[in-house]
Amino acid sequence: LLVTSVLEKEGRSTVAENLALALSMRKEKVFLLNADFRKQNASWLADEEGHLKIEIFQKLLENLKKENDYVIIDTPPFLQNADTEEMAQMADASLLVVAEHRAQAKDLNAALDLLNAQGEKNLGCVYNNAHVEFLRPMASYGYQYAYHYGRYGGHYER
């Protein structure tokens, strides 16, 4: 499962870590792979120019999948690193972390379009750092309700 975001500081690594923790608490065998090779501890995945060593990554991923129930790949932001798209092609599924008021709708749409171009592999988005006031109307009971649907980055109420 590839976990990515549109921009930095959207909580991508925190979501990946918490997902790995939750799965391991269910007694699943989980490997959390830091594939953000711009950071020092993952630099062995990149060549001198800073590009992903695809063959090494693919072999690593194959081996990890054989030994674990889940492999969670924490990647650089999707639109800021071309190698993330290549990693998404190798992953079985992807999850996009979106922090409230961070990415512009056009950037979110671009990232989702690229992820969705890989087939049915994109599981959806994690809406992170949401303000409680935004969620409160959706948590109440009664006759008043709203449907939120449409193109990414917009919603329509009915």
For the regions a language model picked out, list residue spans one by one:
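Switch II (G3) loop of P-loop NTPases
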Residues: 33, 48-84
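Inter-motif core of Ras-like GTPase G domains
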Residues: 66, 80-101
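Walker A/P-loop NTP-binding active-site region of P-loop NTPases
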Residues: 1-47, 84
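Conserved beta-strand segments of the P-loop GTPase G domain that flank and frequently precede/overlap
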Residues: 2-4, 33, 71-75, 96-100, ...
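Flexible beta-alpha connector loops of hexameric P-loop NTPases
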Residues: 44-54, 97-103
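Hydrophobic micro-sites
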Residues: 106-158
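Conserved nucleotide-binding/hydrolysis micro-motifs of P-loop NTPases
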Residues: 37-39, 77-79, 101-104, 129-134
